[in-house]
């Protein structure tokens, strides 16, 4: 999801900075021409912060306090905890609704930041859900998972399986003539 968002944002003219903790994914982002840096550095430069990680507090209070006055934050990841909104509230001297699903947090350091959808999943709370292309991939992955379960009935251990490792591109040796 993150790489697709970067592609679209760059196509719209954004100067995209990628904050990636996985070294391989960070290298891929750099090879695609994106600037890559830790969130602690990016916090000082960015105007709009979009999270798509699924990890807790990837944008934490100390990052937010370093952001420019007027920065925007949105979470499009997997859970409501990517932006530490509860911690942010402790530094807010005033919170006001600008419009539905957009709040201004006036902070005790004199800056203001704007949070979409109260830090919840902005693509679900503020919009009408996922685009059709995302749903197509989600349903295709679910179908592949069901196919795997059916083909391996009675052979599987009671554990989690990673779908992307089960279905890889065939090598030339795998293709029959």
Regions found by a protein language model. Give the residues of each.
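Single conserved hydrophobic/aromatic residue that forms the stacking wall/gate
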Residues: 1-7, 167-177
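Glycine-rich phosphate/diphosphate-binding loop of Rossmann-like nucleotide-binding domains
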Residues: 3-4, 8-43, 51
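Metallocofactor- and cofactor-centric catalytic cores in central/energy metabolism, strongly enriched
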Residues: 15, 41-44, 48, 52-57, ...
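Conserved active-site and cofactor/substrate-binding residues in soluble primary-metabolism enzymes
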Residues: 21-24, 37, 44, 58, ...
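Short, glycine-/Ser/Thr-/acidic-enriched flexible segments
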Residues: 23-24, 55-56, 78-81, 120-122, ...
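Rossmann-like adenosine-cofactor binding region
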Residues: 35-111
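Adenosine-phosphate binding glycine-rich loop
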Residues: 85-169, 173
């Amino acid at each position: 999801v993150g790489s697709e968002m970067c592609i679209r944002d760059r196509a719209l003219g954004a100067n995209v900075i990628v904050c990636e903790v996985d070294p391989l994914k960070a290298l891929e982002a750099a090879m695609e021409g994106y600037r890559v840096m830790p969130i602690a550095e990016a916090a000082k430069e960015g105007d709009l912060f979009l999270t798509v990680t699924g990890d807790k507090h990837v944008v934490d209070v100390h990052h937010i306090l370093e952001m420019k006055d007027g920065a925007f934050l949105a979470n499009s990841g997997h859970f409501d905890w990517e932006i530490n909104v509860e911690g942010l509230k402790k530094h807010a001297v005033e919170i006001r609704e600008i419009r539905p699903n957009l709040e201004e947090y006036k902070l005790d350091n004199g800056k203001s930041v704007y949070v979409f959808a109260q830090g919840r999943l902005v693509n679900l709370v503020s919009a009408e859900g996922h685009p059709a292309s995302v749903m197509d991939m989600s349903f295709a992955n679910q179908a592949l998972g069901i196919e795997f379960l059916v083909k391996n009935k009675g052979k599987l251990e009671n554990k989690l399986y990673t779908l992307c490792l089960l279905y890889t591109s065939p090598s030339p040796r795998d293709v029959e003539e």
